[in-house]
Amino acid sequence: MLMPKRTKYRKQMKGRNRGKAHRGNSIAFGDIAIKAIEHGRIDSRQIESARVAMTRHIKRAGKVWIRVFPDKPLTAKPLETRMGKGKGSVEKWVMNIKPGRIVYEMLGIEEGLAREALALAQSKLPFKTKIVTCESENEIY
């Protein structure tokens, strides 16, 4: 599972996920990618399950880049616990995703096969996405 090695503070405030992505919104390494088209939150398990689905479909050919990293701790209190007595313990690590963010990239795979693999990964993600190529990337949403 992806998570930071160490953080300055153990717990964070929830915050708000507004606006569109100004960083990580263009293809940098590959030639075909998955781009988010709505707000969402992705955790380390979802990142890993989508990566496994893609790499199994392409049979380890080519190269896959994960362009997101879960660096925000999500806390939860145990079930059937009364309110109060402090904030819950860290349950999982997440990343807030804004529209326009590139989530995965691929290189060195035939486009038809790459689209099938990315479609498998799309079904594992909790927000709407679209497949973009270097040529079609200028269309933001």
Curated annotation (Swiss-Prot):
It holds the Pfam family Ribosomal_L16. It comes from the Bacteria. Residues 1-23 are annotated as: Disordered. GO terms for cellular component: cytosolic large ribosomal subunit. Gene3D superfamilies: Ribosomal protein L10e/L16. GO terms for biological process: translation. PROSITE patterns: RIBOSOMAL_L16_1 (PS00586), RIBOSOMAL_L16_2 (PS00701). InterPro entries: Ribosomal_uL16, Ribosomal_uL16_bact-type, Ribosomal_uL16_CS, Ribosomal_uL16_dom, Ribosomal_uL16_sf. SUPFAM superfamilies: Ribosomal protein L16p/L10e (SSF54686). Keywords: Ribonucleoprotein, Ribosomal protein, RNA-binding, rRNA-binding, tRNA-binding. GO terms for molecular function: rRNA binding; structural constituent of ribosome; tRNA binding. Binds 23S rRNA and is also seen to make contacts with the A and possibly P site tRNAs. Part of the 50S ribosomal subunit. Belongs to the universal ribosomal protein uL16 family. This is Large ribosomal subunit protein uL16. The lineage of its organism: Bacteria, Pseudomonadati, Campylobacterota, Epsilonproteobacteria, Campylobacterales.
